[in-house]
Structure formats: structure tokens, C-alpha cells
A protein has these predicted regions:
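Non-catalytic accessory/interaction domains
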Residues: 179, 202, 227, 243, ...
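Bacterial Sec-dependent N-terminal signal peptides
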Residues: 1-24
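Structural detector for internal amphipathic alpha-helices that build alpha-solenoid repeat scaffolds
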Residues: 542-546, 570-591, 603, 611-626, ...
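Short inter-helical turns and helix N-cap capping residues of alpha-solenoid HEAT/ARM repeat scaffolds
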Residues: 565-566, 608-609, 643-644, 674-675, ...
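Hydrophobic alpha-helical and helix-loop surface patches within well-folded domains
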Residues: 2, 17-18, 82, 206, ...
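Amphipathic alpha-helical scaffolding segments comprising HEAT/armadillo-like alpha-solenoid repeats
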Residues: 550-560, 583-605, 625-640, 660-672, ...
Length: 822
């Protein structure tokens, strides 16, 4: 699963509960689930699922006289065993079936359960990664665009079929899904039969022959067009999109076959499943989900060719694909060991970026991951493998993802590439179609390398925190001396063992690498050099999971930026030279008043890597200091010539307040750019000065389906606050994906604030529906925030009271207690 993070730490203060977590080990297995056969059909009118489950089970080891299934929120119509109806007890969560006798591990039994799943009647939970946990979702069920899909992780598949809903339970399956014959279905495994019925329905029989985890079982149905990728012949690779987007399937997903081949080559293990399908659905409650052979994506991956110029979702696609080895083929045996799934998937994003887009792109991916972890580490530090937590959903954080991926890279650097991938091969083959814990991974590495690696796994997987180093360097009498101290305090009370690279650079651009090994609180290293270095860089590729405080003069940082061969080294130098609090524009201007720093920033707009060019452009937003004309000229060149759309777009935004009519010529030319991000930025920049043809410009773009362009048009319409714009706002907002909708709700709020009461009342049904019915808690919360802007209206107060009463997510319920409506 890949997290789609939208709101950082919104509820941290709400949930900082002083509570000692309990030990969370693997679920005890009293029974083994051998095979699941499901006959299911959706009732679109009441958003329920009619089902019959035939479950083949056997005692795991000890004899048993009853079985308990996870079955959340069902109406259980009857249960039979050995062709006879049997009594059962059911509390709405657990379904207990007694046998009246003891069964031993040589007995295989078949239980038949007739039921109706009622997911909308469940109390809703969720997390940052998975915003709801009711398992089965109906989207627009009473319209031609209706969809049905499931989300099983962590333990929500028991909301739509009875099972043993734990990650250490594997099964094979047959699913018979009956739907209207106009709909397309998808499930795990292969579609082996279509049965047409006389009532305009069809039953699709999907069969999964190889065992996989229960939480990876899925179904989906809707109006989808299936595109089979003809560039790949080893097995079926296919993509499911709604009809209006089907023509873009290969542009969106078409690098999947190359990813498969690359990962197979790295791991020495062929893709282990029958097929690989990807489907994009609306209102998905996560970023994406690696259901075996049938990955589900949120509709954020659905992009037009103009949007793909700005950004593709290769990282997400690679992430979910890599799970089919790490997570699906070998599955974590408990949520405590989740990094065995997610850290590897996170690392795959680096592997693919490095392979396909180049080493600099891989470094940039790693930099972003490290930044994500370090931000989270300011508020919590946990072991990667956590046997103590309050809620399994807490495991889905930047520790399990970003930090874990970086730790795997450190392990790779320590043992070497060949040993790393050979060890992964051993791990995958030894645990194929089974579950694993962290020590299975350690023992695979020890088997290959011949080295005891407990120290590494204890230090990085089983202990919280990260390394923090203080570094000083000085050169005297032909010798460079490094003094490195490890910070020891209440947050970090241990000494790390750290192999580190040191990059030493000289005035002629020459560089040399040295290696040091830290194992003490304070250590001194010396190197004989023929000349004084112009910069010294610890960990030049940014591979250490940690923080390095290495004070340097500006001249050294400038030399480091200009001469360092790594993106990480240049990034660190640029960041230190130009860092300022995000809201402190005056401080930024003061930094750029230094001609040497300003010159470097202008040089950085020509960096070989687009991410650093973009950072440089962003430092020049609204610049009005010394050397203004030089800055303006450089930004004009960026707009005309930079190959990256995001850099061009940011250059336009940097110049939008420069008040030079000549720039408007550039902006108008940019309205024809292939990139929607560039067009949106150009439109925003032009509208700043409210040109005579502003209304005509906006009219041209008001129906373009892109969030960047929407935001530019919406800001203009919000300031106008004309009554007739309400239908445009609500219509367009309904078309946006979840992330996009959250991003622009503030603009709609601006429109409402500046409108009269009649328009505000007209918006209330839209906001009320969103606040109650959106599956994503952050969208419901955003709708409430917009309603509060018009909260003086009696009708709004009444609506808010109804929203608060209808809310089932405990996080939001707790927040809403703070709002006074009277």
C-alpha cells in the first residue's frame, strides 16, 4: 500500500494519550483456512452484498470443537456443515460455530455461510494510510457511473466475507461475482468463466490458485474498459480505466512491463502470479493497494497527456508492483513486522527511479523519503519493528515506509550490491507463499554473507531513533582532521556503529573518497593531503539515516555546491546557503542580498537536475532586491528553455508580481504550453493585473479538467463572487479527485465568504453531502471547515449539528466536540 498524505499531524494533539501499548504479536492460529469460495452479488439500492461463503478449514495443530470467524456487521441467514444446518452464535463481529465434537489436524471440514454484508452500518475507523475500514464501498450506486470495490488491509475484508482476518492467514480462492451484464469486474487470479443469466446479469468466475493473504483478496465492478498491454507476452498485464480515460491507459501504466523485467532481474525471482492488473477507482480510501494480481489505485493516477507532462505516477506503480514479491509472495506475519512489506515497497521507488530516470532521480527520491521521515521523527520515534502499539493502523507511517526504505539502502551499501540482492533472493525463495518476520530476513543475509548481522538489525530495525552527528574539520600542515561526535541524550541513548564515506573536494574540481567507521561517542580521523580542500562532505550521497551537523563557511558551501558530483551534496549545500523559514520573506531577501549567494542561486537554475533547478527558482519568488534585472532575465530564460514543466511553471509564478509588461508576452505564450501546470501558472500570472481580456481568458480554460488550471480560474471567480458561478464551482468540484478536492476547498470558501446569504444557502446541500457521505475523513473535515465559514446562518448551524451527529470516525467526533454552534 502506498500512503497518500494530505494533512500532516492534524490530530496529534487529539490523540497524544498517555497509554502503555500492549504486546502485539502474531495472531494465534487455531485453524488453517485452506480455500475460500464466494458467491456474491451487490444490492446497489441499499449498498449491501448478498453472499454465500464456502470455507474449507482444518485445525492448525491442536484439536478443536468450535471455530470462530471474523465477520463484521453481517446479517447471518444460516450456516451448514456436513449438509446440515448448525447452530451458531454471533455478536456482530465474531461468528462462532460449534461442532459438538473434537476435530483434529487431519480433519478438513467445509462450512457454508449464507449472509448479507452491510458495510454502511459499521462503526468506521481508519488511519492516515487507510481513511476508512469498512471493507466494501459503493460509489454513486444509483447512477450509470456506479462502482463497487473493496479495501482489505488491514483487517477489513471480514466486512464483506467471513474469514480469519489476520495477516498470517493464507488461502486460495474462487469468487463468483454476479453483476449487471454491462459492468466489468476484476478480482484476484484469472477470469476463467463468464455465465450469462436471463435477467440481464452475468456471473464472472475468478480463480486464485496460489495461496495469498486474506487481506489481499479483492473485487471491483463498474463501467471500466480493459486494456491489455500487447508489449508484454509472459503473462497478461492489463489496465482498467473508465471509458473516457481508456485511451490514456498505456501512457499512464505502460512502463509496468519494464518494471516487471527490471525487478525480476534484480531479485532473480520471476513475477510469481498468474497475471497483473491495475485498476483506478473513484473515492478510494488509500493511495493504492497491492491486492494480489489486481492492484487498486485511487483516481489520482488518471491523467491526460498534458498532465503526464507535469508528473506521472511511476513511483506508485512501482511501489505496488514490488509488493507482489514483498508483501504478497512473502507476507508479514504480523502488523508489527509491517516494514517487511512497506519498507521494501518504498525502496522500490528508489530502485525504479535510479534505473529508468537516472542516478540523480534516484538520489532525489531518497532525499524526499529521508525528509519525510525526519519530519515525522520530530514528533515520534519508534522501532521499525514494533511489537508494542495501541492500534495496528499506527504502523502505517513514515517509519515503516520512508525510514525502512533508507535502512534497506544502508544495508545494501554495507554488504554490497551482489550480496544484497542474493540475500533477497534467498529470503524470497525460502519464504515463498508464506509469512515471515524480521529475523527471517536477517538470517537470509547471514546465510549469504557469512556474517552475524544482529548488530545491524538490532540497531536499525529493533531500536527507535537515528544517528545524530556533530562534525568539525580543519586542515593544518598537510593533514585534514575530522572530529565526529555522536549525540547521546534522553532521545538517543545509544552509540551507533556507522560505516561512512567522506568526500574531499579541491579547487581544481578533483575529488577523493575516504571511508571511516564510527563506533565510539567521539572519534578523530586524519588524512594526509597535498593541498587544502575547498570542501569536506560526510555521507556525500545522503545514505545515512540520521542528521549531520557540520558547520561550514559560505565559501566551503559554495564550493560544495559547484563541484560536488552528487545531488545530495549539492542539495545540502544549497539548502544551508539559502535556508529561511517558509514565512519569512524578509529573511530570504536578506540572504539574496549577498552577491555570492545570489550568484549561486542563479547558477542553480541551470543545475543538471530539475529538482535543484526548481529549488533555485522558488528562492527567487517575488524578488525585488539588488540585481533584479539579472534575476528577471534568468527566470525568463527558464520559462523559455527549461525542459521540466514544473520548473517552468514555478518560474512563471516567481515572476507574476514583477510588473513588467514584457513578461505578459511570455505568460501568454505559455498558455499554449503542453503542460497544464505551466498553463495554470501562466493564467494565474496574467490575472494578477486583471488585463482587459481577463474574462475571455478565463472562459477559455473554465472547462479544462486539471487542478492547476481549475485553481487559477476558481481564484478569479471567487474574487468576482457572482451568483451564477455557484453551479460552476459545485459541478467542477465534483469532478476533482480526492487530493485535488482537498487542495482547492479553500478557494471555494473564499467564494462563499464574499457571496450573499442566498448563494451561501445554495452551497449548503453540496457541503452537507460532502461532510456526511465522503468516505475520506479529511474531505468530510474540509467540508465542515467550509460550512463553518458560513456558520452564522441558522440553516448552516442546523446542518452542522446533523453532520456532527452522523459522524462515525472517532477522530473527527473528538474534534467536533470543540465547536460551539449555539
Amino acid at each position: 500500500m502506498r500512503i497518500c498524505l494530505l494533512i500532516s499531524f492534524l490530530f496529534i494533539t487529539q490523540f497524544s494519550i498517555a497509554q502503555l501499548p500492549e504486546y502485539q504479536g502474531s495472531a494465534t492460529k487455531k485453524w488453517d483456512l485452506l480455500h475460500t469460495k464466494l458467491y456474491v452479488s451487490p444490492n446497489w439500492d441499499n449498498e449491501q452484498l448478498n453472499g454465500k461463503a464456502i470455507l474449507q478449514i482444518k485445525p492448525h495443530f491442536y484439536s478443536q470443537n468450535e471455530v470462530t470467524f471474523d465477520a463484521k456487521g453481517f446479517e447471518v441467514k444460516g450456516i451448514s456443515y456436513n449438509s446440515k444446518s448448525v447452530e451458531f452464535s454471533y455478536d456482530g463481529l465474531k461468528l462462532v460455530v460449534p461442532f459438538g465434537k473434537m476435530l483434529n489436524r487431519r480433519d478438513t471440514v467445509e462450512i457454508i455461510i449464507d449472509y448479507v454484508a452491510k458495510p454502511n452500518e459499521l462503526e468506521v475507523g481508519g488511519s492516515e494510510a487507510i481513511t476508512q475500514d469498512k471493507g466494501l464501498y459503493f460509489v454513486d450506486p444509483k447512477t450509470p457511473k456506479r462502482q463497487l470495490w473493496t479495501q482489505g488491509e488491514t483487517q477489513a475484508n471480514s466486512c464483506w466475507f467471513p474469514t480469519f482476518d489476520t495477516p498470517n492467514e493464507n488461502h486460495t480462492q474462487d469468487i463468483f461475482l454476479r453483476v449487471d451484464k454491462t459492468l466489468t469486474t476484476l478480482s484476484n487470479g484469472e477470469l476463467i468463466e463468464k455465465i450469462i443469466h436471463g435477467d440481464n446479469t452475468r456471473t464472472d468466475h475468478w480463480q486464485m490458485k496460489k495461496p495469498h493473504a486474506v487481506y489481499l483478496t479483492m473485487i471491483a465492478a463498474g463501467n471500466f474498459v480493459k486494456t491489455v498491454d500487447s508489449t508484454f507476452n509472459d503473462f497478461e498485464v492489463s489496465y482498467y480505466l473508465e471509458p473516457e480515460y481508456a485511451e490514456n491507459a498505456l501512457a499512464i501504466f505502460g512502463r509496468t512491463p519494464q518494471m516487471i523485467c527490471h525487478f525480476e532481474e534484480l531479485l532473480g525471482v520471476k513475477y510469481p502470479w498468474e497475471k497483473y492488473s491495475q485498476i483506478a477507482v473513484r473515492e478510494f480510501v488509500s493511495g493504492a493497494m497491492e491486492n494480489t494480481t489486481a492492484t487498486v489505485h485511487g483516481d489520482f493516477v488518471v491523467k491526460s497527456p498534458n498532465q503526464l507532462v507535469d508528473n506521472n505516477d511511476d513511483a506508485v506503480i512501482a511501489h505496488e508492483l514490488f509488493h507482489h514479491w514483498f508483501g504478497d509472495l512473502v507476507t508479514t506475519e504480523s502488523w508489527a513486522n509491517l516494514p517487511l512489506n512497506e519498507s521494501f515497497a518504498d525502496y522500490s521507488e528508489y530502485l525504479w527511479a535510479s534505473h529508468f530516470y537516472g542516478e540523480e532521480a534516484g538520489e532525489w527520491t531518497a532525499i524526499q523519503a529521508m525528509e519525510n521521515y525526519l519530519v515525522e521523527a520530530k514528533t515520534k520515534q519508534e522501532p521499525l519493528i514494533r511489537y508494542f502499539y495501541n492500534d495496528r493502523e499506527d504502523m502505517f507511517d513514515s517509519h515503516s515506509y520512508a525510514k525502512g526504505g533508507r535502512v534497506l539502502h544502508m544495508l545494501r551499501r554495507y554488504v554490497g550490491d551482489e550480496a544484497f540482492f542474493t540475500s533477497l533472493n534467498v529470503y524470497l525463495k525460502a519464504n515463498a507463499f508464506k509469512t515471515a518476520e524480521i529475523h527471517n530476513l536477517r538470517m537470509a543475509f547471514e546465510e549469504v554473507t557469512g556474517e552475524d548481522l544482529n548488530w545491524f538489525f538490532n540497531q536499525w530495525f529493533l531500536t527507535a531513533g537515528h544517528a545524530r552527528l556533530d562534525v568539525e574539520d580543519y586542515y593544518k600542515n598537510g593533514k585534514l582532521t575530522l572530529e565526529i561526535d555522536q549525540t547521546i541524550d534522553s532521545v538517543n541513548a545509544k552509540i551507533y556503529h556507522l560505516p561512512l564515506d567522506v568526500l574531499i573536494g579541491f579547487s581544481d574540481g578533483k575529488t577523493i573518497y575516504k571511508k571511516v567507521y564510527l563506533k565510539d561517542e567521539s572519534q578523530v580521523f586524519s588524512f594526509e593531503l597535498d593541498e587544502a580542500p575547498t570542501y569536506v562532505l560526510i555521507d556525500p550521497k545522503g545514505e545515512l539515516v540520521g542528521e549531520i551537523n557540520h558547520p561550514k563557511k559560505s565559501e566551503m558551501l559554495i564550493s560544495q555546491y559547484r563541484n560536488c558530483p552528487t545531488v545530495s551534496g549539492r542539495f545540502k549545500a544549497f539548502q544551508l546557503l539559502t535556508y529561511a523559514p517558509e514565512t519569512d520573506e524578509l529573511y530570504v531577501k536578506e540572504l539574496l542580498s549577498d552577491s555570492a549567494v545570489r550568484k549561486l542561486v542563479l547558477e542553480a537554475t541551470k543545475d543538471s537536475f530539475w529538482g535543484l533547478r526548481d529549488m533555485a527558482v522558488q528562492r527567487l519568488f517575488d524578488y525585488d532586491g539588488e540585481g533584479f534585472l539579472e534575476v528577471e532575465k534568468e527566470l525568463q530564460l527558464v520559462i523559455k528553455a527549461d525542459k521540466n514543466a514544473n520548473v517552468r511553471a514555478d518560474a512563471i509564478l516567481a515572476m507574476k508580481n514583477f510588473l513588467n509588461p514584457q513578461n505578459d508576452i511570455l505568460f501568454r505564450a505559455a498558455l499554449r504550453d503542453t503542460s497544464y501546470a505551466v498553463r495554470g501558472a501562466a493564467l494565474e500570472a496574467l490575472l494578477v493585473n486583471n488585463p482587459p481580456d481577463a474574462a475571455e481568458l478565463v472562459k477559455v480554460f473554465e472547462d479544462v479538467r486539471d487542478v492547476n488550471i481549475f485553481a487559477s480560474v476558481a481564484n478569479y471567480y471567487a474574487e468576482e463572487a457572482k451568483p451564477e458561478r455557484l453551479s460552476w464551482f459545485t459541478g467542477r468540484l465534483k469532478e476533482l479527485g480526492n487530493t485535488e478536492l482537498y487542495q482547492v476547498m479553500g478557494i471555494f470558501g473564499t467564494y462563499l465568504i464574499q457571496s450573499d446569504a442566498e448563494i451561501q444557502l445554495g452551497a449548503l446541500p453540496f457541503l452537507n453531502d460532502m461532510a456526511i457521505n465522503k468516505p475520506q475523513w479529511f474531505l468530510r473535515y474540509a467540508a465542515v471547515q467550509a460550512m463553518l465559514l458560513i456558520g452564522d446562518l441558522p440553516e448552516t448551524k442546523a446542518a452542522l449539528k446533523s453532520v456532527f451527529e452522523a459522524e462515525t470516525d472517532q477522530r473527527l467526533k473528538d474534534v467536533y466536540l470543540n465547536y460551539q454552534l449555539d
